[in-house]
Amino acid sequence: MPLIALTGGIASGKSTIARRLAELGAVVVDADQIVRDVQAPGSAVLARIEDVFGADVIDADGALDRAALGAKVFGDPEQLARLNAIVHPAVRAESQRRFEEAASAGPETVVVYDVPLLVEARVDDPWDLIVVAHAPADERRRRLVELRGMAEQAAQELSL
């Protein structure tokens, strides 16, 4: 089973590449979706996040309030490390389960791991190929504004 890591920064084109590879028959495992899945309401990961960061990171529906959590961890390397210590092991285990599930389809199955932060998440895996999506910073900012609805000022402030 060929295992391909697809990585790159925000709005670099990862999702477009992943969609095209899926159209060609690859099984795409989406790290961002796995993060959302392991942090779903009622999950052990979400309960641990609440224990560590407080009830104010949970919204009225019992889901993670990403903005509230972000306010606590971004800009504070120690807090971000605490969050990563909770989330990364669960993401690693679930992604491994999905890789194994894809492999059961046969040895020819190509598996693509769409992961924004490969170096932080799964750098030690035996990748057959690492693909880095790249686009110039001005193009990435344009995509963020036009395709994702980000405020132009916020896009300009990003370090890309």
Question: Locations of the language-model features?
Answer:
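An amphipathic alpha-helix signature
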Residues: L46, E50, A137-V145, E152, ...
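Short, acidic/turn-prone active-site loops that include or flank metal/cofactor-
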Residues: Q33-R36, A135-D138, L158-L160
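ATP-dependent small-molecule kinase phosphotransfer cores
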Residues: Q33-V110
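Short alpha-helical
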Residues: S12, A44, E78, A90, ...
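Residue-level signal for inorganic ion chemistry
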Residues: G13, D32, L83, V112, ...
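Short, structured coil segments at secondary-structure junctions
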Residues: L24, F53, P126-W127
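Walker A (P-loop) phosphate-binding motif
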Residues: M1-A26, D30-Q33
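ATP-dependent NMP and nucleoside kinases share a basic, alpha-helical "lid"
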Residues: R92, Q96-S104, V110-E146
